[in-house]
């Protein structure tokens, strides 16, 4: 029986790192849904799209594919250009739009269908995979999350200040929690883990215990 693991939480809570390492530890597939929203944010911002009608038309021209650990946008390989604070804000802006969420939710459900997988995002346990076998909700203080994101961006060679990263975190928290469509919130049956003072290894260890209890992998 497939074991689908949903990992949700706000920007910078450690979702991506935890999800990748967890998938590696379990030997199963990993899906970064946040990257998909960033790709759509990049594409729609490049095309100056605003109305729902324009968004729906542009989404019909959009093809997101995933191969060998890389995302492709209409055949164009996507790299660190989607990891900037600016694109993060665009991603959160367009994530509020129903056509975008419907478009990506359909793709995400199709990818996760009938296989063991770690899916990471903001509405996985509540909207995308409400029947996931394991649901985890990660949280951390805004300053801790900003420090992590800043370090990550510096290592990737992205030029940004800590203040810019912290401002993005604060803004995205507000946008993600207040949007009408699929707002960021903990699923009732999700396990809450505060990662502020935990190492990545400690977080992984806690999640693996839950997976062992609920899945046969």
UniProtKB/Swiss-Prot annotation:
Subcellular location: Cytoplasm
InterPro entries in the record: Cytidylate_kin, Cytidylate_kinase_dom, P-loop_NTPase
GO cellular component: cytoplasm
EC number: 2.7.4.25
Annotated keywords: ATP-binding, Cytoplasm, Kinase, Nucleotide-binding, Transferase
Catalytic activity: CMP + ATP = CDP + ADP; dCMP + ATP = dCDP + ADP
Annotated GO biological process: pyrimidine nucleotide metabolic process
Residues where ATP binds: 9-17
Main enzyme class: transferase
Pfam families: Cytidylate_kin
One Gene Ontology molecular-function label: ATP binding
Family: Belongs to the cytidylate kinase family. Type 1 subfamily.
NCBIfam families registered for this protein in UniProt: cmk (TIGR00017)
Protein name per its UniProtKB record: Cytidylate kinase
């Amino acid at each position: 029986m497939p074991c689908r693991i949903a990992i949700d939480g706000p920007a910078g809570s450690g979702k991506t790192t935890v999800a990748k390492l967890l998938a590696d530890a379990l030997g199963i597939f990993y899906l970064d849904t946040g990257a998909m929203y960033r790709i759509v944010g990049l594409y729609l911002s490049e095309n100056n799209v605003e109305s729902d009608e324009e968004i729906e038309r542009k989404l019909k021209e959009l093809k997101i594919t995933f191969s060998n650990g890389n995302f492709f946008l209409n055949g164009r390989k996507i790299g660190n250009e989607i990891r900037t604070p600016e694109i993060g804000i665009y991603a959160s802006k367009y994530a509020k739009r129903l056509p975008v969420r419907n478009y990506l939710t359909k793709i995400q459900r199709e990818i996760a269908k009938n296989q063991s997988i770690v899916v990471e995002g903001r509405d996985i346990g509540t909207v995308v995979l409400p029947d996931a076998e394991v649901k985890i909700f990660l949280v951390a203080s805004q300053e801790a999350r900003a420090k992590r994101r800043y370090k990550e961006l510096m290592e990737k060679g992205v030029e940004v200040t800590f203040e810019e990263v912290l401002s993005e975190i604060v803004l995205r928290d507000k946008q993600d929690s207040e949007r009408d469509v699929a707002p960021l919130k903990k699923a009732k049956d999700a396990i809450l883990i505060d990662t502020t003072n935990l190492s990545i290894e400690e977080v992984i260890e806690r999640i693996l215990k839950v997976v062992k209890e609920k899945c046969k992998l």
